[in-house]
UniProtKB/Swiss-Prot annotation:
This is Large ribosomal subunit protein bL31. It comes from the Bacteria. Pfam families: Ribosomal_L31 (PF01197). The keyword Transcription regulation does not apply. It comes from Campylobacter concisus (strain 13826).
Length: 66
């Protein structure tokens, strides 16, 4: 690898919307995510709707029975 052309590789704190945090390595020092393994329905076994931008309401409004 060439010297002085690669971004710095630092410790990173990943923060989920549910409050879970964990450490990893990245080019960024902090990353925020919407869903992680502690709150994802596949891993928890519970079903919940994740709608951060109102997409479900927009879909229902667009395709509502008239």
């Amino acid at each position: 690898m060439k010297k002085d052309i690669h971004p710095e590789y630092v410790d990173c704190t990943v923060t989920c919307a549910c409050g879970n945090t964990f450490k990893t390595k990245s080019n960024k020092s902090e990353i925020r995510i919407d869903i992680c393994d502690k709150c994802h329905p596949f891993f928890t076994g519970s079903e919940k709707i994740v709608d951060s931008a109102g997409r479900v309401e927009k879909f229902k409004k667009k395709y509502a029975q008239k």
